[in-house]
Amino acid sequence: TLLVARNNEIAHLSSQGYSSVESKKPIQNNSIYRFYSMTKPITSVAIMMLYEKGLLRLEHEVSRYLPEFKDVKVWDEGTIDNYKVRSPSQPMLIKDLLTHTSGLTYGFMTGHPVIKLYNTSGIASAKNPETKKEMDLEEFSHTASSLPLLFDPGAKWHYSISIDILGRVIEVISGDTFDNFLKKYIFNPLNMVDTDFFVPEEKHERFVDCYQELVSKTGNKLKRCFKGGEDIYSKPRNFLSGGGGLCSTLADYANFCQMLLNNGSFLGQQIL
């Protein structure tokens, strides 16, 4: 789906291809996609709303809102079965979460023993390894804080679950669930009617399948990873991922982008 906006209006909106390759079901202009990491800008705007209200500072320590991060440690040396940790040279700040300089990582990455800990602890899947149930943001934050950081906060950049942790910060400061906060202050004012952490059953017909490109010497092909209406995004979830959990349409997300282009204003409302 392609959308072009000009002068606060949609100038072009068209679709081509399939929402399901197997059934040759065509993409629609209002098809619902998994927006994955395009969730991050929305979570970041939510944080800046709290900043504008004076409810947090970017230089505040994360542990001010999430006490579980007060005693977080940094990986020092060793192996996955026998390792040493040390205290960080400086505390993790809110701005470190916003800029991916927190020392956190992602479970799908490679090259460091801590990443394996993300998988065995359930952080990678956001599922408790014992109960097999999906974590909520509180449990996710506590589990993440129990694992070593890759490096001292602020030392360097590394893509990570930092924005997911900000989702929990929003819950603690606002006293509301993350999804309710987004609906009240972002989705409803921006008329983002098809944006949520799951796609309700009445919209499954518009929910596209998700594919991965498999590259090989004999030629590339598509592998279906998720089928619209049958995956974890097709029913209410416990894990409200601020880093990659939203589903939406291009028209909805265009409203969000238009608000940013208008210096925080949308249809006469000052959102940010």
Describe each PLM feature range.
Residues 1-5, 61, 160, 183:
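Outer-envelope exported proteins of Gram-negative bacteria
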Residues 1-35, 55-57, 71-78, 83:
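Short, conserved catalytic-motif segment at the N-terminal edge
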Residues 14, 60, 176:
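Short beta-to-alpha loop/turn elements within the nucleotide-binding domains of ABC transporters
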Residues 63-68:
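PAS-family sensory/regulatory domains
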